[in-house]
Amino acid sequence: MVDLVKTILLIAYWYGLAVGVSNFEVDWLTGEAIATRRTTIYAAVHNASLITLLILFNLGNNSLKSEFISARYLHEYFFMLMTAVRISAVLLSLITRWYQRSRFIRIWNQILALVRDRPQVVRGRWYRRSIILKFVFCVLSDSLHTISDVSAQRKRITADLIVKLSLLATLTTIFNMIVCQYYLAMVQVIGLYKILLQDLRCLVRQAECICSIRNRRGGVYSIQCCSLADQLDLIAERHYFLKDRLDEMSDLFQIQSLSMSLVYFFSTMGSIYFSVCSILYSSTGFGSTYWGLLLIVLSTASFYMDNWLSVNIGFHIRDQQDELFRVLADRTLFYRELDNRLEAAFENFQLQLASNRHEFYVMGLFKMERGRLIAMLSSVITHTMVLVQWEIQNDES
């Protein structure tokens, strides 16, 4: 029987190689990442060709500069800004992946070693569901976005326009693949956190059972407490190493995170604004037909779901750390104290969690948290309302 998740990972891996996002190979027998000559040459040629096409595109008659001069509607100016932001985000991300390639390979192999020690991570229901959902909505978002671009320009299709749309579709695909690789790495880290939580819950239950032992002068009680203390120290060591890998990943994906924030901000504004423009008049190319509006609704819904999965995955890390605190706090409900060594092990682990919490800052500009996300959504809605009001006023005049 075909393993759906393994098939999805294979498709993502080969697709990442094909579009020049991955500049190293993975041995599927061992899972080890290595930099090979053929992959390096292919990725370098692909990226250089892409940059050359972008330069030629901006020097031609249909460049962003010429379109900016000939634009008549506000939504045309806005989508040129979106295109410029997306191009800049892709180029910055690709450049980052070249000069930090050795770090990408090292963190890949380190995460792989952790997963190899805990193979139940890849067999977990949450892990499989997360990968399948991301694949479905990423494919839907990418496909519907391409169909929307072609449908909006269907009345003036030319050879130059086909090249332009193909180039923009390639950029969109590259950006989505970069986000997908970040997502897959975070899913594996969260899977490791879930295994860590399971082991900690089991240990706390065992410690609670030990509390019921009345005769504490015998050797059985001391041996059991020492055994649990050793297990807790190992769990704390696993958490420290996993947290260290997570901090390195956060530092490694700084440019990609900033690019994601900018692209998602403008794309969310653009999808709402473009929907309103399609209803107001037919200059967008959809002509407000039922099929056109249905395409907009489906494209917007899949785009938002894909974005939400990519953004929310980072918040799950903080949720797992908060859950570690709550599980350790259950120790205070025990009706009797434990052995001194086991109590010290619990206190040391709590101190480690309190002093080494994961805080993710995007290029030192702002901290990624749910409150910040709500503020960004509020800003998106406010700016979109301003654009829509301006469009309605000019449409009436």
Curated annotation (Swiss-Prot):
It is found in: Cell membrane. It is a multi-pass membrane protein. One of its GO terms (cellular component) is membrane. Keywords: Cell membrane, Membrane, Receptor, Transducer, Transmembrane, Transmembrane helix. GO terms for biological process: monoatomic ion transmembrane transport; sensory perception of bitter taste; sensory perception of sweet taste; sensory perception of taste; signal transduction. GO terms for molecular function: ionotropic bitter taste receptor activity; ionotropic sweet taste receptor activity; ligand-gated monoatomic ion channel activity; taste receptor activity. Expressed is restricted to taste hairs in the labial palps. In larva, is expressed in neurons of the terminal external chemosensory organ. The chain crosses the membrane at residues 4-24, 40-60, 76-96, 167-187, 260-280, 285-305, 373-393. Pfam families: 7tm_7 (PF08395). InterPro entries: 7TM_chemorcpt. Residues 25-39, 97-166, 281-284, 394-397 are extracellular. Probable gustatory receptor which mediates acceptance or avoidance behavior, depending on its substrates. This is Putative gustatory receptor 59c. It comes from Drosophila melanogaster.
